[in-house]
Amino acid sequence: MSERPVRSILHRRRFGPDLVSARPDETVRDAARRMAEQHCGSILVVEDGRLLGIFTERDLLVRVVAAGLEPTTTKLCEAMTANPETIGAEEPVEEAVRRMDEGSFRHLVVVSGEHVLGVVSTRDIPALTMARMAGELDRRHRLAERVW
């Protein structure tokens, strides 16, 4: 897994012009609706092109619902995770996994210099692992065919 760079697992809806984002003054409800529509577990909070934070399903549950806040009036800036941890696009996927595991979070913002490229989540890792395992099994099968 360590050979592949993080950029290789960015999905279309989580990077570039399709990146799901919101302003800090938007309500939690509006952000949650957009997350549901886009089938994603996080939304980046951005203002004037600057990353301020990330709002995740866990933030919704812990910082809003469990705290008894009203989603229709609570602003994202009140419930987001400010200054989220980031990882460089060329860092190995293994490093992303390590950071998410050690930090007990499920989403990691991918950057190139000061530019946000996207978000990877723990949901992205199993698919990568399965694809690598399938490739390895195929390689071994071809090797076995040559030997026999």
PLM region spans:
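Tandem CBS (Cystathionine beta-synthase) repeat/Bateman regulatory domains
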Residues: M1-W148
